Amino acid sequence: MKYSIVIPTYNHCDDLLKPCVDAILKYTNMSEVELVISANGCVDNTREYLDSLKQSFDSLGFADHLKTIWNDAALGYSRATNEGIKVATGEYIILLNNDAFLLPQERHRWIRQLAGPFETNPRCGITCLIKGPSAPAGHDFAVFFLVMIHRRVFDKIGLLNEDYGVGGGEDTEFCIEAERAGFEVCECVPKMWSTDGNLFTGDFPIYHKGEGTVHDPNLVPDWGDIFFINSVKLARKYNRAWFEEKTKDLPVNHQRLKSLDPGIYNEIFQINTYGVERAEIQDRIVIDIGANIGMFSLLCHEYDAKTVYAIEAQPFIFRRYLKDNVLPYEDIIPLNYAVHRDFGQTVRIPNQGGLSKIGNQGDIVETITLEKLLVDNRIQNNNLVLKLDCEGSEFDILLFTRSDVIKRFDIIYMELHGNTNENPVLQDPNLIRFYLQD
């Protein structure tokens, strides 16, 4: 297959996905193209539509030209897109937002225009409609609502960075890394910007609604916060001056949020419930499971930890508090997982009462094991520090983690709660003590 069109989609089946796909089928020579739709977190009629679309492709004789991917959890733009790229077979990968609609044109014109720069420029790796500046990155980038990327770019620099969550910034980073690897990012048509610099016109037959998913408050309630946090991530990597300017007035004392939760502040910073000493933390990697709003992680920052991985299961607390609280500090990495005995599952986390244990109602969150957490983050050190405060899941995490993995931690801080495991054998704290000493 020469071209693969990858479309990530999150709900909005009738108003976005359907018209997007209808236009592709109408104005594209499908004999040269495969369509890959990566559905994630959809609770509308997307599944039924994809089933009917498969039947349509079968009837047209293009059964092998449609691939669909389904994930119950909302993965975010980068991850959902990467899932599509992984199964795509084309030499050229077209990334297309579901809120972009082809306009009337000669069949296949849009493909030819995107492919044009590849034919005249051997260094071209990415073609796009819009290339503009990113202030946080201090670099130009292609806006990924529609781009064509040669497979050799992915082969050399990898897929989109999934650290940007919902989205915003992954396209900038990908373009920067592609250029550093020797590729060029090329606009496929000339454009003319409006006087205010917000709109442009050009000779390309497409209409882009513009962030139709992330601007839906029912799907992404805090897009402004997410975009700012992702901008800081970019600046940390590529434009230190922007990062330092934006975060210069955010010292740790301000970030402790005493008025938000004075109990947690006092517990960690003044009472020092865990009995933490600087010498135990300094220059070590800390795994903070049950980070809540980030107070323990910030204490570790003050004690000069090398890196702190702040893991919080509750999506609301993670988005609204933890990420913002640790934002200015490069040594604190916030992660939204439910650490458990298994990984790769999706569980529901209750957003109430400050609890972070796995429950039967609430937001869907992906599970991860302690071992996989270390592997995924390339943590190879053996003098690690572990902190556990996860409302009863501490027992499951420790008892179902291999002993050789546990022994990589020199120090374990743990707040014990009632064990949620129904097996009475696993409810005895002495069993934990025996296990750790084994």
Where are these regions (language model features)?
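Conserved donor NDP-sugar-binding/catalytic core segment of glycosyltransferases
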Residues: 101-139
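Short beta-strand/loop segment that forms part of the nucleotide-sugar
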Residues: 32-42, 67-71
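Short, acidic, metal-binding catalytic loop of nucleotide-sugar glycosyltransferases
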Residues: 22-32
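Phosphate/nucleotide-binding beta-alpha loop and adjacent structural elements of enzyme active sites
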Residues: 242-438
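C-terminal catalytic/acceptor-binding lobe
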Residues: 166-247
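Short aromatic/hydrophobic "clamp" motif used to bind/position activated sugar donors
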Residues: 93
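A conserved acidic beta->alpha catalytic loop
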Residues: 39-49, 341
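Glycine-rich, basic loop-to-helix element that forms the pyrophosphate-binding segment
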Residues: 70-88, 140-141
